[in-house]
Design a protein with these regions (language model features):
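Conserved "right-hand" nucleotidyltransferase catalytic core of DNA-directed polymerases
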Residues: 1-143, 165, 209, 229-433, ...
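Structured ligand/cofactor/substrate-binding pocket environments in proteins
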Residues: 9-12, 448-480
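Short, basic/hydrophobic alpha-helical segments
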Residues: 147-162
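Acidic, metal-coordinating catalytic cores used for nucleic-acid/nucleotide bond scission
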Residues: 162-174
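Metal-dependent phosphoesterase core characteristic of DEDDh/y 3'-5' exonuclease domains
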Residues: 171-224, 286
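Short, polar/flexible loop-turn hinges at active-site or ligand-entry regions and domain interfaces
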Residues: 181-183, 199-200, 216-221, 240-246, ...
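Generic long, charged, amphipathic alpha-helical segments
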Residues: 480-502
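Short, amphipathic alpha-helical "recognition" segments used to contact nucleic acids or chromatin
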Residues: 505-515
Length: 530
């Protein structure tokens, strides 16, 4: 019956799925024959497009004679010198410039309890430093048997008159500060500069930046052996491996200097150098200190909130089981699907290869079918609150500081916004009462308060300026609520009758358009049709 009712669709599908053999082709079959291809030209295109995997897949590494000659030249561009720390310190003080690369390794993970209870924010230790001297075109490498040996560099690292250039300085700041060194004089971070040049580039490590800006494959350049692990001996010092490290990290610090020169040149070309120098680079230190200071968590308040949630979850579990007429695992999609669609005979909205779908979209559509759906949605919300914000936050509380030291990033989002991870402090819920309780566990020090400063609708002001939209400009000039005004027009409601929800929806529309949201994305966010 379904086939008969949809026979037009069936014939259309057949037409679409049939390969047309009657297409007029003017060229000869011989013209399509694959012959020898210009590997040097392909390599050039792949490098331009950063198709590094294809370079490997088609064995194009070092294919051209020019590339090989360039690599030989590049290998002779700097000299690795063995000097004493004292000699190098004098050179740095004289030049008032320090281009460096820190090598760090994860703390001993054999004792997981000690690792979890570590007071360090970043559970890594500094094992070496490489330094580049541009005047003499030399690199120096020092490895440390103990992390505290880097204290020999403390004076120059803390001297703000000595300008520093490196990569991922937010991490460097924390690594140094947690052992008692407060780095100052931060001038250049190549990962930040590269991000400004291309905010969609998420490969900002030294190896990828070297390929992008210098067209050098670091592994090929350094001569990293694939079987390097065979050289490892866990019970005795390995000289060959140490020499490999020396070679590798000396090259890295040299690359940092070369990449930095190219980045600064490009930033000036696009008039973004002042932005980099006066806004983004000072932000590195601000974000680093924010991560270092962390946010205090009231553990007792968190524990009490967790207890409340557990009690509410237990009550909801009991109610759901009673409404279903039997006990089952509410967290099991399979068991929940069987209860709702087989036992309770609710309409099937969507099926997956594993059975019935019970995702939030499906449950939202079934809310009017049975009161159990509302209970299940509430249950899931409470479970997420408990796992993400109660149990989740607990694991990030530093045992010494009693604070959460979230990582703040300025080189991740394509829009230029700051983001945070481990944990994400920017998605703490606010829209419902229980969500607001989560925020109450974050408290300032005694006698201090949190200050929330924000540009007022900055994106829309920029949009008004660029678009020269008279209505928007007038609204801002008259200090009118732009979102409320939009809601009034969209919902055809008098300005003084616009509800909080309508304003919120209009705000989503306004910002969604600015950031290029799709009709599907906006519909999903607002729960409306496309």
């Amino acid at each position: 019956e379904k086939i008969e009712n949809n026979k037009d669709l069936a014939f259309l599908s057949k037409t679409l799925g049939t390969i047309n053999l009657e297409v007029p082709i003017e060229d000869n079959l011989e013209d399509f024959k694959v012959e020898e291809w210009d590997k040097e030209k392909v390599l050039e295109i792949f490098k331009e497009l950063n198709f590094n995997r294809y370079i490997e897949r088609f064995n194009l590494k070092g294919n051209s004679q020019n590339t090989k000659e360039q690599d030989v030249e590049k290998k002779e561009e700097f000299k690795q010198k063995d000097k004493s720390i004292e000699e190098v310190l004098e050179i740095i003080k004289k030049q008032k410039k320090l281009t460096f690369f820190l090598k760090s390794e994860k703390e001993d993970g054999n004792n997981l309890t000690n690792l979890a209870n570590s007071e360090k924010i970043i559970k890594e230790k500094i094992t070496a430093i490489s330094i580049y001297n541009k005047e003499n075109n030399e690199t120096y490498y020092f490895d440390f048997n103990e992390e505290k040996e880097i204290f020999k560099f403390k004076e120059i690292l803390e001297n703000k008159e000595i300008l520093k250039t490196s990569i991922n300085l937010t991490k460097v700041y924390i690594l140094l500060r947690q052992i008692g060194i407060l780095i100052d004089g931060i001038e250049n971070d190549i990962s930040v500069g590269a991000y400004i040049l291309n905010p969609t580039n998420n490969k900002l490590d030294i190896k990828n930046l070297t390929m992008q800006y210098l067209e050098i494959d670091t592994e090929e350049y350094i001569g990293t052996e694939e079987n390097e692990q065979e050289q490892l001996n866990l019970f005795e010092e390995n000289t060959e491996l140490k020499n490999n490290d020396k070679k590798e990290y000396s090259a890295y610090v040299y690359f940092i200097e070369m990449i930095n020169e190219k980045i600064l040149e490009k930033l000036k070309e696009i008039n973004a150098y002042e932005l980099y120098k006066n806004i983004d680079m000072p932000t590195v230190e601000v974000l680093s200190s924010m991560q270092w200071n962390g946010m205090y968590i009231d553990e007792e308040e968190l524990k009490e909130f967790g207890k409340e949630l557990t009690e509410k979850i237990e009550i909801l579990t009991k109610e759901i089981h009673e409404m279903a007429g039997e006990e089952f695992n509410i967290n099991s999609t399979k068991q929940l699907g069987e209860i709702l669609f087989e036992k309770m005979k609710l309409p099937i909205v969507k099926k997956t290869k594993n059975g019935y779908s019970t995702d939030v979209d499906v449950l939202e559509k079934l809310k009017s079918e049975d009161p159990i759906i509302e209970k299940i949605l509430d249950y899931r919300q409470l479970m997420k609150l408990n796992s993400t914000y109660v149990e989740g936050l607990k694991q990030y509380i530093n045992p010494k500081t009693k604070r959460i030291h979230s990582f703040f990033h300025q080189t991740i989002t394509a829009t230029g916004r700051i983001s945070s991870t481990e944990p994400n402090l920017q998605n703490i819920p606010t829209r419902f009462e229980l969500g607001k309780r989560v925020r109450k566990v974050f408290k300032p020090e005694e006698g201090k308060v949190y200050i929330d400063a924000d540009y007022s609708q900055i994106e829309l002001r920029v949009l008004a300026h660029i678009s020269e939209d008279e209505h928007m400009i007038n609204a801002f000039n008259n200090n009118e609520d732009i979102h409320k005004q939009a809601a009034s027009k969209v919902f055809k409601t008098p300005l003084d009758e616009v509800t909080k929800e309508q304003r919120s929806n209009a705000k989503a529309v306004n910002f969604g358009i600015v950031y290029g949201i799709s009709d599907f994305g906006l519909g999903e966010q607002l729960g409306i049709s496309r």
